[in-house]
């Protein structure tokens, strides 16, 4: 049995962080957490690029452009959708999630999602590191691991065909 896993060593990786400006009180903390986690795992500041878009609904379009640029080993979507009194929350959260998932399937680079979907601002801030843990950092570490396992998977030889 052969087992392939991604390491958490990010030395030499180039990472694109795509951040929604809407709910910036939360998304800026996700960005801080993601960038800090990448540095702690070995990514140099010069190998981290930050792209900002208006909101979480717009994230997938920019994320796809960044992922397709072939400049990055990994891209991370960072956003926050907070429930309000209308169905808008479900539409934005659902479509953003579908968009990120589609990009992950179509892309040659690792794609990770750090989009919070919370009932309250307080919940979002907690998940952005105010109390404990930072989902932006977790998404960045997942991107590192996925980038490394994708590299390993690319090295797996094709099966030989019987002639």
UniProtKB/Swiss-Prot annotation:
GO terms for biological process: riboflavin biosynthetic process. The keyword RNA-binding does not apply. It comes from the Bacteria. It catalyses: (2S)-2-hydroxy-3-oxobutyl phosphate + 5-amino-6-(D-ribitylamino)uracil = 6,7-dimethyl-8-(1-D-ribityl)lumazine + phosphate + 2 H2O + H(+). GO terms for molecular function: 6,7-dimethyl-8-ribityllumazine synthase activity. Pathway: Cofactor biosynthesis; riboflavin biosynthesis; riboflavin from 2-hydroxy-3-oxobutyl phosphate and 5-amino-6-(D-ribitylamino)uracil: step 1/2. GO terms for cellular component: cytosol; riboflavin synthase complex. The keyword Transferase applies. (2S)-2-hydroxy-3-oxobutyl phosphate binds at residues 85-86, 127. Its EC number is 2.5.1.78. The active site is at 88 (proton donor). 5-amino-6-(D-ribitylamino)uracil binds at residues 22, 56-58, 80-82, 113. Keywords: Riboflavin biosynthesis, Transferase. It is an enzyme of class 2 (transferase). Gene3D superfamilies: Lumazine/riboflavin synthase (3.40.50.960). It holds the Pfam family DMRL_synthase. NCBIfam families: lumazine-synth, PRK00061.1-4. HAMAP family: Lumazine_synth. Belongs to the DMRL synthase family. Catalyzes the formation of 6,7-dimethyl-8-ribityllumazine by condensation of 5-amino-6-(D-ribitylamino)uracil with 3,4-dihydroxy-2-butanone 4-phosphate. This is the penultimate step in the biosynthesis of riboflavin. This is 6,7-dimethyl-8-ribityllumazine synthase.
């Amino acid at each position: 049995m052969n087992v392939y896993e991604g390491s958490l060593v990010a030395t030499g990786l180039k990472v694109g962080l795509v951040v929604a400006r809407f709910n910036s009180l939360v998304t800026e903390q996700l960005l801080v957490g993601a960038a800090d986690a990448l540095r702690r795992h070995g990514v140099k500041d010069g190998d981290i690029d930050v792209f900002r878009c208006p909101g979480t609904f717009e994230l997938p379009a920019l994320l796809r452009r960044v992922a397709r640029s072939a400049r990055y080993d990994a891209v991370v979507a960072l956003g926050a959708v907070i429930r309000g009194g209308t169905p808008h929350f479900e539409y934005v959260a659902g479509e953003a999630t579908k968009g990120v998932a589609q990009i992950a399937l179509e892309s040659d680079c690792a794609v990770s999602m750090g989009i919070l979907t919370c009932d309250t601002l307080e919940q979002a801030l907690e998940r952005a590191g105010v109390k404990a843990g930072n989902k932006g950092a977790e998404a960045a570490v997942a991107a590192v691991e996925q980038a490394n396992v994708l590299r390993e998977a690319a090295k797996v030889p094709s099966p030989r065909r019987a002639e």
